Amino acid sequence: MDKIEQKFIGVWELDEWVVEKPNGDKTFPFSGNVDGFLIYHSEGWMSATLMQKNRTDVSNDRSKIAKISHLLKNDHEVSLEGDLLNTTKNYFLAANGYVSYAGEFNADDINVYHNIKTSLLPQWVGTTLTRRHEFTLKNKSLTLSAESDGFKDFLVWKKV
C-alpha cells in the first residue's frame, strides 16, 4: 500500500455534506440532517454509508414484504392500497434517504478511487467513483469532492 493510501486507513464520521449547484447556490442534502461513516481498511478495502437521520421505521413483517415484492416484480399494473401502499411508501423513503457501497480502493496525490463491488444502487456495481481528496488538521479531517452534471459535492469527514 502506498504512503498516500495509508493516510486514509481508519474510520471516518461524516461532519458535513454540501452540494454546490451549477448556479453557485449551496444546499445541504437531507436538509443537513445526515450521518455517515467511511471506513478504509489496510487490505485495500473500503465501505461508505450515508443516511438521512430520523427516517420512518419500516415493517419487519416478512410475509407482507414478500407479498409486495412479488406484486411489484410480477404484476406490471399493480395497484397497492392501504397498508401495502403505506409499507411500500415507507420503504421507498427509507431507501431514498440512504446510500451505501463497498469495494476496493486506491489513491494518488489528487484522487481516491472507490472500485464498487456492492451498492444499494445497482448501477454503481462494477464502476469506479473518483473523489478528489484533501487532508487537513494533521490528517484528522478529510474532504472528498466530486463533480457531476455541474453539481459539486463536498463531504467533510472527521477521523474517529
Residue ranges and their predicted role:
Residues 1-160:
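Lipid interaction determinants
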